[in-house]
Amino acid sequence: MSVSSIADKIVSESILIVDFGSQVTQLIARRVREAGVYSEIVPFNRAEEAFQRLQPKGIILSGSPASVVAEGSPRAPESFFQAGIPIFGICYGQQVMCHQLGGKVTANDVDGEFGRAFIDVIAPSPLFENLWKVGEKHQVWMSHADRVEALPEGFKPIAVSDGAPFALIADEKRRFYGMQFHPEVVHTPDGGKLIAHFVHDICGLAGDWTMAEFRQTKIAEIRKQVGDGRVICGLSGGVDSSVTAVLVHEAIGDQLTCVFVDHGLMRQGEAEQVVSLFREHYGIKLVHVNAEDRFLAGLKGVTDPETKRKFIGKTFIEIFEEEAKKIGGADFLAQGTLYPDVIESVSFLGGPSVTIKSHHNVGGLPERMNMKLVEPLRELFKDEVRDLGRELGMPDVFVDRHPFPGPGLAIRIPGEVTKERCDILRKADAVYLEEIRNAGLYNAIWQAFAVLLPVRTVGVMGDGRTYDSVCALRAVTSTDGMTAEIYPFQPEFLANVATRIVNEVRGINRVTYDFTSKPPGTIEWE
């Protein structure tokens, strides 16, 4: 199959997800992708345009904080119901479908269903063939006040709950399905399978969307967009920019130049790893700027976390712009923008409006230098970027790397940042991560790091008194970084790490562990 044919195949074998403003719409896309089918999320007021572009094989209508019976609440394009393709309505999506097709929805401010609920399957359906059987009871997750009171013509109930007589409905002839619960959340145990049944059995999609196909498609798109032009890419050493650089280089070779601004605030050995991988292993043209002195000079005397962040971000952009001008002739800027950065969100306060989340890793640089953006990862979620990195043959040490903040160690050193304190923290952090890897725990943890506190305590080493710094250890589990739980290390593990740090890292004589979840705390200390 040719590259252009692969691109056409991905677009034609897709699911369109219409967003009515639900907080969990992204999870719908995740479940469809997990079923091996490409999906796109669009706000309801741009859905018709997206439908014409994608020509999807099925439509999913999301939930919403709005009420179908409220004046001005969002609607699906009427043309969707005449298109002859399957539709899957979730919560508000079910209600709006029923309302637009002649059913009745009532507002309910008293006794809605919220949280775990159970549905009883009362009729068979191709939607859950070989998954659920008539007479069975299944756990789902509800979050609704309004509910459907009367079904449109052609629909019948196929599952009920205590608070929803039409918990799951079907018009099998038109292949329209609606459910009052949320199959996209993990609290509906069979929800992912239900969505997979919809895209495979109802929409007839094979589920063969793979990273290998995505890779070839993106290579073709990059070559078409860039032509004979030149591209620069800012490398941070993180997963997103690294995968972007390798993919773009595979597409256009020496037309790409990467700029790696080393601010002296990276983890131990990280700068050397970046240079080695990209310059020596991949043969990518790389400009390595050692700007440690410039950053540390600007941070002298600075203790406020926000001031640190702003200075580091501003200085990074200045240096990147200086280097880009030295390179000269660049027509494009490659960025590691991801799908959550560009999904359009919908607000209903004061009427429907669309806010597009912007994501510029180098601020306004593209506009100031008259460059066009190349964003090959903009359709991917974070874990899919890691999958693409593996598909590209990148080393696990880069692909599976824990998130690392742009300001680096500066926000893991509360108080003034100095070279001496950076060096102390680097060593402690390296010991901690080494022990985590040795225990086989690295990939079970979302993020782990050490923090060097601006606190000194008395200790005893040998026969002498010490008065040195305190190191705090942090490790959390998370799926998206929005919320996080502490990682439950065994006490023996933490005791071993603490012993190694105080013995091997001069300048630290006490180690603590941070037991704070997010919320109320943040993952980073500053």
Swiss-Prot record:
Its EC number is 6.3.5.2. GO terms for molecular function: ATP binding; GMP synthase activity. It catalyses: XMP + L-glutamine + ATP + H2O = GMP + L-glutamate + AMP + diphosphate + 2 H(+). It holds the Pfam family GATase. One of its GO terms (cellular component) is cytosol. Keywords: ATP-binding, Glutamine amidotransferase, GMP biosynthesis, Ligase, Nucleotide-binding, Purine biosynthesis. It is an enzyme of class 6 (ligase). The keyword DNA-binding does not apply. It comes from the Bacteria. Homodimer. The active site is at 91 (nucleophile), 182, 184. SUPFAM superfamilies: Adenine nucleotide alpha hydrolases-like (SSF52402), Class I glutamine amidotransferase-like (SSF52317), GMP synthetase C-terminal dimerisation domain (SSF54810). Residues 209-401 form the GMPS ATP-PPase domain. HAMAP family: GMP_synthase. This is GMP synthase [glutamine-hydrolyzing]. ATP binds at residues 236-242. Pathway: Purine metabolism; GMP biosynthesis; GMP from XMP (L-Gln route): step 1/1. Residues 14-208 form the Glutamine amidotransferase type-1 domain. Catalyzes the synthesis of GMP from XMP.
